Amino acid sequence: MIVRETRERPLSWRERVKTVPSWSLPFFALEWVWEWLAFLLSRWAFVVLLEYLGSLSILVAVFFYFHDSDNRVKQRHYQAWQVINTAQGKGGSGGRIEALQELNNDGVPLVGVDVSSAFLQGVHLGKARLLRSDFSAVDARNSDFKNADLQDSDLHTANFRESSFHKASLAGARLDDADLEGADLSDTDLSGSVLDNSDLRFAVLTNSKWRDIRSIKGANVYGVRTPPEGFLEWATQNGAIQMKADIDWAAARPKR
């Protein structure tokens, strides 16, 4: 809102001369000219109109900023997908950590995303919708996949050491040769998953849904923490191994 102050009419030159010392007249003359100019402009309707138009332009700019916010979000998402897709099949991060996290934070489904062979260490993808995604050969150590949906995803030969899959769904996922040492698989759905030759040493399996695991041949379950009742017996009966040292495990697991 514009608040206009009514300017008082300046003194005439004759009156002004009487109020200042004669030696300072040149300085006050310039000030007197500006006072009169300001007074005359304040009474000009066109100047008032310009002031209102200036305020209106600010309001219009604010309106269009918020009105166009959806387009800016779409553009941001498009750029994030470009980063992911152009780096497909390549090593390194290539900005994919930030791109994946941004899309997930905005609630964008990541169904079928292909980040195979990428370096994604420390990525935060809690609650991500990652059905049928390809994380094969990914290095995602110390990452967060809590409550994520990774059903029917390809995670074989990936490194998820010390990562959290608490309450995540790995149903039907391919996890053969995956490194899950020290990973948190508590309350995780492993139904139908393939865990052949996976490293489960010191993994947390509290309350995990393991009974319908498809295959666990050659997997190392040494030191598994809080395993569900009956899990270790079932695992060893179905080809799992309990070996602390890598060299012993390599010698004991089935040859391909």
Describe these PLM feature segments.
Residues 23, 88-91, 100-256:
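Tandem repeat scaffolds
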Residues 1-116, 220-256:
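N-terminal capping/linker segments that flank leucine-rich repeat
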